[in-house]
Amino acid sequence: VVLKQSKSPDITETVIVDLTGRSSQYYDPNTYAFDVAIGGLPFLLNVNDTTPYRRSTARWKYERVDQAREPGEQTLDSGLWVRSQTSFHLGEGVQYQEALEGNAEQLRFRYFTGQGIDPWTPGQISLLKDTSKIFPAATSSSGRVISLPATISGVDYVLHIDCAAAGSTAVRVARVAADGTATSLILGSALSTEILAAETDGTTLYLATATYIYDYDLTAASPTLHAHYQINTANATSVVLQFVKNRIMAGVSYVTGTTPVAAVYELPFAGGHGGSHTNLSTITSVANTTTVPVGWIWSDIAEGRGAIYVSGYAGDKSAIFKIAPDSTGALGAAVSVADIPRGETVRSLFGYLGTYLAIGTSRGVRVAAIADDATIVYGPLIFNTTNPILGFAARDSYIYAGVKAGIGGASGIYRIYLGQLLDDGTYPYATDIVATGTTGSVDALGFFPTSAQLFFSVHSSGTYLEHATNLVSEGTLQTAIVNWGTLEKKAWKRVRVETGTLNGNIEIYADANEGRTQITTLTTGNAYNTDFDLSGAYASTQVNGQLAFTLYRNADSASTGAIMKGYAIKAIPSPTRSRLIQLPLMCYDFESDRRNTRYGTLGGAKFRLSALETVESNGATVLVQDFTSGENFDAVIEEIAFTRMTPPSGTYENFGGIITITMRTVV
């Protein structure tokens, strides 16, 4: 019963709430039988038809307007959140589809990882070409293999060079055509020792061993191996040969007595392919190339705009030098142009178009830009590897790098696209062709000039060639993780996949916390722009969504296979819902609780309202105790409205009425 007429307080009535300051937000209900307490302030409810108790779900989703240059995923309101990809041409290497760092416009064309997939045609993914070992056909090479391109009498070949020391009947150098037809050029009877380096200038093959540098005329009717240079009186421990700026350059490391020596030489080969050999000690090395740390190994040589570049390392220290020719063609001194981060060593160099210098290191690949003055500025690692990068090739807008055991555990090629610099200073990349079942280092790679077929050599295996038409049997692409940049859980609903008429099957998988689950198979001969249910894969709400697509080659034609245009994954966020609770509270000077116990004090209503408004102003979370339902929860006061129900009476203010309080639960 509410006592709406105020009177002088009786001595038996006590102040049940200390309005001068509360020591706790918890109210002990064992004194008076109140209905609720808010932040330690107790109240009775005034629930009736006019002032009901209201409880509703707080708004948890807000309208969004897609203001991108093109209409996007949020423009169309299907009630679901959508993340789609219509192209993959900026390659792999991103874990999250949302831009935690970098450019969102670039991330929308990238994916997490792939194998056997060609993403480089905008608007689709397809299968890569297959590979086969062309030499040796029936056996495997016993060690390091160097493969070099050569065009002899108008026919393209691969020069397959087995580097390990071998017996007299072993084939050390073979000329191999694209169809696998092989001709032995040099046998072990002519050269039995280990080959340390090999290079061609288009017509002559150069080979280096620990004691000699040989030349071999590829165009002669009956060529013979000729020892042109003897490597001093001390045997070389390592040699690198490269044909750059129309000259053969050699980086040689050897030991004189107990002193390691390293030097770079320009090697004149005037006088044809016969005659006596010349001792390398009679050739003046390039200035400054001997003043390197003890134990230095020259690892590679390349050319760029206005200079020759040489790389080397000793221990965990590595550097790149430039050697610039003057107007007469004479070489100047070597000048350091790049120090590599300690612990990372340069193992290969490749100059392309006079503008780019690919740097293969013990940790991966970097690409440097070559300035007009031949200085270089290199970027971060484009991709990381656990084994050194030992060789490169290039064609059109791409650089290709050989990777040991780096594609599903097998050795093969990574392709780097130079056509677009990414915001993080790297270039797009993706895995390319692979030598299935091999794990050796990729020692060399190149292209058949006419057919543009890529070949590469694998340590302890042989030379592999990209097939002219046949595709790999299958390839898989795994998308980046989708979570819309929020850690709220989502109910993953559907995936839409678009294809043309398929020439091979496509299997769709979802990667969830429970593991990978196959969603469906798209079959040959059908075209799709279809939604598929994901509920079987995502049994519970989860933060992240991720898909994988496996494309298959046609069962009847090895030269055709599946092509996928894009996908869209759809989900609805499932955050823990907060509630809006509206309570009508009695606020009079004198009231009676649910046990009909009378309590109150003159002016108590105004004090209680003021105390509640102070709690609201503080903006803090308050404990709400509902003694009618036994529910306790934390909430934030969103609104307090007071309606006065009693007029002044005599000399008393008679302040009292109904407080309507709106609170949002905190979840």
Please report, for each region that a protein language model flagged, where it lies by residue.
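Repeated scaffold domains used in trafficking and secretory/extracellular systems
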Residues: A138-V155, A190-T203, Q230-N246, A287-G304, ...
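Blade-level signature of beta-propeller repeat domains, shared across WD40, Kelch, NHL, RCC1
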Residues: S441-Q478
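Non-cytosolic beta-sandwich-type ligand-binding/adhesion modules
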Residues: L3-V17, Y27-D28, Y32, G39, ...
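Beta-propeller fold detector
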Residues: T183-S189, T224-I231, G275-N288, L331-D339, ...
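Beta-rich globular "head" domains
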Residues: G251, K489-G500, T601-A611, S617
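Extracellular/virion structural assembly segments
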Residues: I572-V667
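Loop/turn-rich, solvent-exposed surfaces of beta-rich toroidal or solenoidal domains
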Residues: T345-R366, F383-L422, E488, R494
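N-terminal beta-propeller domains
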Residues: L3-G188, E199, T204, A208-A220, ...
